[in-house]
Curated annotation (Swiss-Prot):
It is a single-pass membrane protein. One of its GO terms (cellular component) is chloroplast thylakoid membrane. One of its GO terms (biological process) is photosynthesis. It comes from Chlorokybus atmophyticus (Soil alga). Pfam families: PSI_PsaJ (PF01701). This is Photosystem I reaction center subunit IX. The keyword Repressor does not apply. It is found in: Plastid, Chloroplast thylakoid membrane.
Length: 42
């Protein structure tokens, strides 16, 4: 189990988890506020 927790704290696993969370957050923001880039120019 200690090896598994050490594996989960390695850089590729943490970066993949971070990018998945970030992508989900961006998708949800775009779902609730679509075309947010067009607001300042509108």
């Amino acid at each position: 189990m200690q090896d598994f927790t050490k594996y989960l704290s390695t850089a590729p696993v943490l970066s993949a988890l971070w990018f998945a969370i970030l992508a989900g957050l961006l998708i949800e923001i775009n779902r609730f506020f679509p075309d947010a880039l067009l607001f300042p120019f509108g």
